[in-house]
């Protein structure tokens, strides 16, 4: 594999994002401000990951036309659940053997009404974005599952009023979001993922999160044939008290019979023993050869990252006085049609850890896997993406490292990044 940091652009030429900044007439001041804060960085991710110049322009225009108008007022007034800093957008890179990194965008659409009396729980922006994406005519884009989970988890008018009487999102709950989107940028196409959070529905109705999710998944059995696999997961989650207000569901926005389901959640016990337990679903799938192989690599990555073990006091966001080391472990179980059991994925919190040391640990792990190109190029890639930051001093540019292992494709690692030019610390921090 050639260097994915090489570019077809001549040395010294202007980047596509710089050219678009010069020529695009932004319809609002908010959009212009969001572009200057997130657009050039997005452009550096595209270039750094090895996308050719034509594809860079394609995805930059998609960003300007579809994401930028849905970022809401600048600076952000709505604290999103999808990032440690509360920003409504996150970039990530996925790494696999013998391929260039794949860039993804995680995104919660916002509007000027988000969090106001007109739209206290941010429904308007999601509906507007779904309508916009339908007009773009993306390849294989389908909203069946989005509509299904929105119908099951969205708050009714009566539930909204009940939640407001409890104090709304200014009360005890830190979960503010109901839906979010993911965009995979591959092969000149945009693949869409949907996310739905059950926390607010739980607070408004008193129905346990696990029951909300289980009831919703059960309705999909005639088309997705995933109930047996889900039942293994649900049995473990119920007996280990694993469901909580942070649990949520994800799916591919394609035809329902071809989509995967992913169940997410968090746990404050950041210890290897808890990771091992959750990877094997409390021992339920520990004899599976793929699970064993993945667990061995997962333990090696854990040892390289040297994450402080202990019980995290996660209450949303991060605390400035402890370097941000309050983030929990995030887990994810993927359920495919006909699969005998869920496939685990873990997200290790590195928000608050030294970015240079984290990049070295990632590089060492790539070397252990025999991914020599990724190992050699990753530290340079991080500096290329954040040229104005001294990564030997920063601690919050890389937020999470996720790891999964599949029988046919092997290891699968992603890194999640801060997605704005503003530093994720100091007086301009999103509160």
Curated annotation (Swiss-Prot):
Protein name (database record): Reverse prenyltransferase criA
Oligomer and partners: Monomer.
Matches recorded under NCBIfam families: arom_pren_DMATS
Origin species: Aspergillus cristatus (Chinese Fuzhuan brick tea-fermentation fungus)
Pathway info: Secondary metabolite biosynthesis; Alkaloid biosynthesis
Coiled-coil positions: none
BP GO annotations: alkaloid metabolic process
Reactions catalysed according to its record: cyclo(L-tryptophyl-L-alanyl) + dimethylallyl diphosphate = preechinulin + diphosphate
Assigned keywords, A-Z: Prenyltransferase, Transferase
Function: Reverse prenyltransferase; part of the gene cluster that mediates the biosynthesis of echinulin family alkaloid. The pathway begins with the biosynthesis of the cyclic dipeptide cyclo-L-Trp-L-Ala (cyclo-TA) by the NRPS criC via condensation of L-alanine and L-tryptophan. The prenyltransferase criA then catalyzes the first prenylation step, a reverse prenylation reaction at C2, to yield preechinulin. Preechinulin is the substrate of the cytochrome P450 monooxygenase criE that catalyzes the formation of the double bond between C10 and C11 to produce neoechulin A.
Residue numbers marked as site, Required for regioselectivity: 106
An MF annotation (GO) of this entry: prenyltransferase activity
EC number(s) given by UniProt: 2.5.1.-
Residues the entry annotates as binding dimethylallyl diphosphate: 104, 193, 195, 262, 264, 347, 412, 416
Lineage: Eukaryota, Fungi, Dikarya, Ascomycota, Pezizomycotina
Similarity-based family: Belongs to the tryptophan dimethylallyltransferase family.
């Amino acid at each position: 594999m050639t260097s994915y940091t090489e570019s077809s652009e001549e040395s010294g030429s202007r980047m596509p994002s710089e050219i678009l900044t010069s020529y695009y007439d932004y319809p609002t001041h908010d959009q212009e401000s969001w572009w200057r804060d997130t657009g050039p960085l997005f452009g550096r991710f595209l270039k750094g990951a090895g996308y050719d110049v034509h594809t860079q322009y394609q995805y930059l225009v998609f960003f300007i036309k579809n994401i930028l108008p849905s970022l809401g007022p600048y600076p952000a007034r709505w604290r999103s659940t999808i990032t440690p800093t509360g920003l409504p957008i996150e970039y990530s890179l996925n790494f696999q053997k013998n391929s260039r990194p794949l860039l993804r965008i995680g995104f919660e659409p916002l509007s000027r009404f988000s969090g106001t009396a007109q739209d206290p729980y941010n429904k308007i922006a999601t509906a507007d974005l779904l309508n916009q994406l339908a007009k773009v005519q993306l390849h294989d884009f389908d909203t069946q599952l989005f509509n299904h989970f929105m119908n099951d988890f969205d708050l009714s008018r009566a539930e909204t009023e009940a939640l407001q009487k409890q104090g709304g999102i200014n009360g005890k709950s830190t979960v503010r979001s109901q839906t979010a989107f993911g965009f995979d940028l591959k092969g000149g196409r945009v693949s869409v993922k949907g996310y739905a959070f059950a926390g607010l529905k739980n607070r408004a109705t008193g129905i346990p999160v696990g029951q909300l999710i289980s009831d919703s998944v059960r309705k999909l059995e005639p088309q997705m044939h995933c109930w047996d696999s889900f039942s293994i997961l649900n049995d473990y989650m119920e007996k280990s008290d694993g469901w909580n207000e942070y649990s949520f569901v994800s799916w591919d926005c394609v035809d329902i019979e071809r989509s995967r389901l992913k169940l997410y959640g968090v746990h404050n016990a950041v210890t290897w023993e808890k990771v091992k337990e959750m990877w094997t679903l409390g021992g339920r799938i520990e004899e599976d050869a793929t699970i064993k192989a993945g667990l061995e690599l997962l333990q090696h990555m854990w040892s390289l990252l040297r994450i402080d073990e202990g019980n995290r006091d996660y209450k949303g966001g991060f605390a400035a006085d402890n370097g941000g080391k309050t983030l929990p472990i995030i887990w994810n179980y993927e359920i495919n049609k006909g699969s005998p059991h869920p496939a685990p994925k873990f997200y290790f919190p590195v928000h608050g850890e030294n970015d240079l040391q984290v990049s070295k640990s990632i590089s060492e792990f790539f070397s252990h896997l025999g991914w020599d190109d990724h190992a050699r190029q990753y530290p340079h890639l991080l500096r290329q993406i954040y040229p104005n930051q001294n990564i030997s001093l920063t601690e919050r540019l890389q937020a999470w490292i996720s790891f999964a292992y599949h029988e046919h494709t092997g290891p699968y690692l992603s890194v999640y990044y801060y997605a704005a030019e503003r530093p994720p610390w100091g007086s301009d921090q999103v509160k």
